[in-house]
Amino acid sequence: MITDGIMHKVREVYQLLRKEPGIIVGVSNRHVHLSREDLETLFGEGYELTPVKELRQPGQYAAKETVTIVGPKGAIENVRVLGPVRKETQVEISRTDAFRLGVRPPVRDSGDLEGTPGIVIIGPNGILVKEKGVIIAKRHIHMHPKDAEYYGVKDKDIVKVIVESGDRRLIFDDVLIRVREDFALEFHVDTDEANAAMLNTGDLVYIVEF
């Protein structure tokens, strides 16, 4: 039987293993990234996204525009479009969303779309039938190269992250490190993962070494 005393000792060990400072959490709700061509199909020729909220990652923003995504079993309205436009359209949803839509997306890094299921996207000016592009985003940490040097990691490394706040302390395994010059330090999880750990955007988590 695991006693409170044992759990207290375990938490003390985790605190010794964790790397300071903590990393800010960004909880990612379902959203869509659109290519230029697909943006114009959905919203009209020459259309430009309207930024309404800057995201923590430099140059990225939530747009005013929303779409409806439709799968074999259902639809979800008011799905936010994130900007700027990308080379390829990508739809990021949670596993809960996937059940609602009737699709079975894999857990993938952003941009890794080969072999992913398609979906229908409806905008005010048109409808897209995408043959691929739906993923459940792999949990990851964005880092600037200076952050990666500080934490002793490199691009594509896999680490563990501990959640110490709230009543659902846990460790996220298999967390991908993504390093780029235009990234800011942030731990990204989807809404299912955040709910499991009772995490909110702005909370802090810690990389741990074993």
Curated annotation (Swiss-Prot):
Residues annotated as binding phosphate: 86
Functional note: Involved in 1,2-propanediol (1,2-PD) degradation by catalyzing the conversion of propanoyl-CoA to propanoyl-phosphate.
Source taxon at top rank: Bacteria
Major localization class: cytoplasm
Cofactor: Zn(2+)
CC cofactor note: There are 2 Zn(2+) ions per monomer; Zn(2+) and CoA bind inbetween the 2 domains in each monomer.
Pathway: Polyol metabolism; 1,2-propanediol degradation
Binding site for Zn(2+) 1: 31, 33, 92
Alphabetized UniProt keyword annotations: Acyltransferase, Cytoplasm, Metal-binding, Transferase, Zinc
This protein's domain notes: Formed by 2 beta-barrels, each is capped on both ends by short alpha-helices.
GO CC, alphabetical: cytoplasm
Protein name, UniProt field: Phosphate propanoyltransferase
Single annotated GO MF: metal ion binding
PANTHER family registered for this protein in UniProt: PHOSPHATE PROPANOYLTRANSFERASE
Location in or out of the cell: Cytoplasm
Catalytic activity: propanoyl-CoA + phosphate = propanoyl phosphate + CoA
EC main group: transferase
UniProt record, GO biological process: propanediol catabolic process
Positions of Zn(2+) 2 binding: 140, 142, 188
Pfam families registered for this protein in UniProt: PTAC
Assigned protein family: Belongs to the PduL family.
Enzyme nomenclature, EC number: 2.3.1.222
InterPro entries listed in its UniProt record: Asp_de-COase-like_dom_sf, PTAC
Residues binding CoA, per UniProt: 27-29, 73, 80, 99, 195
